[in-house]
From Swiss-Prot:
Quaternary assembly: NDH-1 is composed of 14 different subunits. Subunits NuoA, H, J, K, L, M, N constitute the membrane sector of the complex.
GO biological-process terms attached to the record: aerobic respiration
Disulfides per UniProt: none
Name by which UniProt lists this protein: NADH-quinone oxidoreductase subunit H
Catalytic reaction(s) noted: a quinone + NADH + 5 H(+)(in) = a quinol + NAD(+) + 4 H(+)(out)
Species of provenance: Rhizobium leguminosarum bv. trifolii (strain WSM2304)
Segments crossing the lipid bilayer: 13-33, 50-70, 82-102, 115-135, 161-181, 198-218, 263-283, 286-306, 321-341
Superkingdom as given in the UniProt entry: Bacteria
Amino acid sequence: MDSFFSTYVLPAIIMIGQSLLLLVCLLVFIAYVLLADRKIWAAVQLRRGPNVVGPFGLFQSFADLLKFVFKEPIIPAGANKAVFLLAPLVTVLLALSTWAVVPLADGWVIANINVGILYIFAISSLEVYGIIMGGWASNSKYPFLGALRSAAQMVSYEVSIGFVIVTVLLCVGSLNLTDIVNAQHTGLGTMLGLPASFLDWHWLSLFPMFIIFFISALAETNRPPFDLPEAESELVAGFMVEYGSSPYMMFMLGEYAAVCLMCSLTTILFLGGWLPPVDIWILNWVPGIIWFMLKACFVFFMFAMVKAFVPRYRYDQLMRLGWKVFLPLSLAMVIIVAFVLKLMGWA
């Protein structure tokens, strides 16, 4: 009995506790990411942004949460009620479940599986089903058009993201996210005789793929300038136009969880994860999770700057960029990286 408890029950309890702790921390972080997005957007427009609830508006997201929770959900008369309510739940659960394999620091991961990046790629591909369900079940033309746009957009840019992952796999030889970070201890900088630093991270050696992944991440998460599925000037609010109260909040939560995931993946694949910018003793004292958070916040800041300065693409421009530019370019980079690795004997 004792062996059964120590072998099965105790690890399950520990994993559930870790999952709940990660979930709470993630939800709080998403609340402040949403606040930061609004603050940055306001600063660009020379406004103050949310500044009433709490000091400097720090509790604004929690006030919005309470507002949504206490509102009555309204279901359109011709909507499929079950699918209409299930759609936001599917979206948010899939978005949150991907975080189980994301290492926030060395050893700070719930499930350190050897196909971590493949797991994230598979689960994030399923998130479009929640959007399609919501658009179809609303029984309205604007949500349905937004859902169709989202499906086409995500399929188009997932191909490029897949080729980016292949290039990283060729360089590292593993799909484990922890191994990908540890492989960036050495790289282009150490080959030139320099100490371990940010020059060893993949952003420099795989710079074209870094740019492709960054832009594809914007399209994958429906962020501007690729927010065609919820373009306010064309589709009002897109697939969310018939949603309000808690279901709308769950859609927004799933969207920002996916944004945070893409920022974290960019950090892991190209910015060295939890590694310090320079391998010196004073920077090594800083906990790895601090470096990870700083890098992820920097990537999100770049996401917000793109939203502020780049106008929305037309739908034909969006498709052309994905299929005629990123797809052949990423495929060519896979061939070039494989050729260089084989030529130099690093494969």
